[in-house]
Amino acid sequence: MNQERVFKVLLGPHISEKATVLADKQGQFVFKVATDATKLEIKKAVESLFNVKVERVTTQNVLGKSKRTARGLGKRNDWKKAVISLQPGQDLDFTSSAE
C-alpha cells in the first residue's frame, strides 16, 4: 500500500465519550475511515503509520442524520467508522503529540 492511500484510508480519530471509554478500558481505538476502505487496508494503514500490531478491525457504516433547516430538510453525510483492537502489550498514543 502506497503512502498516499494510507492517508486517504485513515481520515482521523473519532473522539467521543464511547471511544474514550473503549481506549481506556479495552485498548481499542476508533477512527473515521474512507467509505470504500476494506478491513485489510485499514489494518495495514494503522500498522504502517503508528508502528503497532493490529489484532482485529471491525467496521460500521454510520448513516447521516436528517436535519431540518429553514429551507427544508437536509442530510448529513454518511461515513464509516473502524474500531481497531491492538495486540496485548501494544499501545497507540496519538493524543500526546497534539499541542
UniProtKB/Swiss-Prot annotation:
SUPFAM superfamilies: Ribosomal proteins S24e, L23 and L15e. InterPro entries: Nucleotide-bd_a/b_plait_sf, Ribosomal_uL23-like, Ribosomal_uL23/eL15/eS24_sf. One of its GO terms (molecular function) is structural constituent of ribosome. The keyword Acetylation does not apply. GO terms for biological process: translation. One of its GO terms (cellular component) is ribonucleoprotein complex. HAMAP family: Ribosomal_uL23_B. PANTHER family: 60S RIBOSOMAL PROTEIN L23A (PTHR11620). Belongs to the universal ribosomal protein uL23 family. NCBIfam families: PRK05738.1-3, PRK05738.2-4. Part of the 50S ribosomal subunit. Contacts protein L29, and trigger factor when it is bound to the ribosome. One of the early assembly proteins it binds 23S rRNA. One of the proteins that surrounds the polypeptide exit tunnel on the outside of the ribosome. Forms the main docking site for trigger factor binding to the ribosome. This is Large ribosomal subunit protein uL23. It comes from Ectopseudomonas mendocina (strain ymp) (Pseudomonas mendocina). The gene is rplW.
